[in-house]
Amino acid sequence: MEYSSKLRFAVSCSSNMNRSMEAHGILKKRGFNIESYGSGNQVKMPGPTVDKPNCYEFGPTTYEDIYADLTNKDLHLYTQNGLLHMVDRNRRIKSRPQRFQAETREFDIVLCLEERVFDQVVDFLNRSVGKSGNPVHVINIDIEDNAEEATFGAFFVADLCEKLERSEDFEEDIDQIITDLEENNPKRNLLHTICFY
């Protein structure tokens, strides 16, 4: 696929279901070179009760599998709470949830959508035996895990990506771009660090 962006972006939430997929969809429509991931051990989604989540394995499980499973378990519940709508959106963007720690491709920028995910991604990158030595900028943007915040947050992520993409030298400008966004959005908990592949 041809991308209009020069930078390689990744976006990660915990399960590659809600926040990262909302951002992936918007960035993909805008022509960014974007991939999305989860950083957790499993794909976890709300179940019939708080103590009974629906859990799926990263790797073999497709969004189609998840859609069929939720439909078979309780069509009414998962239609009412929006999960089927969310999974339907996801299967139109890509085939399956992916785990960041299983990815071998390199990115220029990894956007994490909560601090716990940021910590997991940074820990993974710092523990990995580097091959290329290429830098990767890891940025945290806190986005609450619900449909409305995922949408607002995705536009915030897209705004950040557009600013980075337009920069003549994003490596030089990234700190100022983040500082400017943080001043206008103090609740987003923007964090930034550099790791190496």
UniProtKB/Swiss-Prot annotation:
Changing D145A: No obvious phenotype. Fails to suppress abnormal synapse and axon formation in a sydn-1 and syd-2 mutant background. May be phosphorylated by kin-20. It is found in: Nucleus. Belongs to the SSU72 phosphatase family. GO terms for biological process: mRNA processing; regulation of locomotion; termination of RNA polymerase II transcription. GO terms for molecular function: RNA polymerase II CTD heptapeptide repeat phosphatase activity. This is RNA polymerase II subunit A C-terminal domain phosphatase ssup-72. Changing S39A: Does not suppress the locomotion defect of the kin-20 ox423 mutant. Protein phosphatase that dephosphorylates 'Ser-5' of the heptad repeats YSPTSPS in the C-terminal domain of the large RNA polymerase II subunit ama-1. By regulating the phosphorylation status of ama-1 and thus ama-1 binding to specific polyadenylation sites, regulates alternative polyadenylation of pre-mRNAs, including unc-44 and dlk-1 mRNAs. This results in the tissue-specific expression of unc-44 isoforms. The keyword Thylakoid does not apply. Its EC number is 3.1.3.16. May interact with synd-1 (via C-terminus); the interaction may prevent ssup-72 binding to RNA polymerase II ama-1. May interact with RNA polymerase II ama-1. Signal peptide: none annotated. Expressed in epidermis, intestine and nervous system. Coiled coil: none annotated. The lineage of its organism: Eukaryota, Metazoa, Ecdysozoa, Nematoda, Chromadorea. One of its GO terms (cellular component) is mRNA cleavage and polyadenylation specificity factor complex. It catalyses: O-phospho-L-seryl-[protein] + H2O = L-seryl-[protein] + phosphate; O-phospho-L-threonyl-[protein] + H2O = L-threonyl-[protein] + phosphate. Disulfide bonds: none annotated.
